Amino acid sequence: VGPITRIRKRITKRRRAGHPPVVMFDFDGVVADSFEVFYAEFTTAMRELGFDKLETREDLLKLMEGNAIKGLLRLGFPVWKLRQLSEEFRPRIEAANARVEPFEGMIELLSELAGSHPTYVITSNQTSAVEAFLRKHAVENIIEVIGADKEHSKIKKIRKVRKRHPGHAAWYIGDTKGDMVEANIAGATSVAVAWGWHSVETLQKGRPDHVVYHQDSLRSLFLPNA
């Protein structure tokens, strides 16, 4: 994205600053403390498919600095194996998600926001797995979970939500550099959380509009009188 495009997008964000928010959450690393579970299941699936370029935690975190699917292809993962990867990984991660716990305070915050503003979950996880997690923790009023099985590109997913809510200011909350880059390209105000997968130093490379270090800081962005 060039400097002129970035300036135009930030002007657009400022013009929408007085509008009510439509809030989009990433799932893994923002709501769910899932890195270790995801890492174990993903690397196991990769090894079983004969791909050995994603062995360490650092390898996975590096992959998440951009679009994960494009990153896999750049590493040499065969495009014709993507469907097989999805078929191998989906049941693993759906079963593994039963072991995943939410970050402290995030269930309450998600419920509060969903009761006050249009709220979505936009994730690279599977839609059904995230929906099961939300049901387990009694989170209601999420308009839709849009997972990788519906659309791989977060840019497209964010833009889809923006089109549904033209009178709202779009916000995307994520925990990776890739999340920040995609949110900015899609025209959403990008919020980086410091408790997720990427360090604050890495997150800053994605040019987030906000960095929050605690759930209460996130609450104050959207529920200042709570």
What is the predicted function of each stretch?
Residues 17-18, 114-117, 163-169, 225:
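Glycine-rich phosphate-binding loop signature in dinucleotide/nucleotide-binding domains
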Residues 107-115, 162, 180-184:
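Surface-exposed amphipathic alpha-helices with a cationic face
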Residues 16-104, 115:
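N-terminal helical cap/lid subdomain that shapes the substrate entry/recognition surface
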Residues 22, 155-180:
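Conserved Lys-Pro-Asp/Glu-containing loop-to-beta segment of HAD-superfamily phosphomonoesterases
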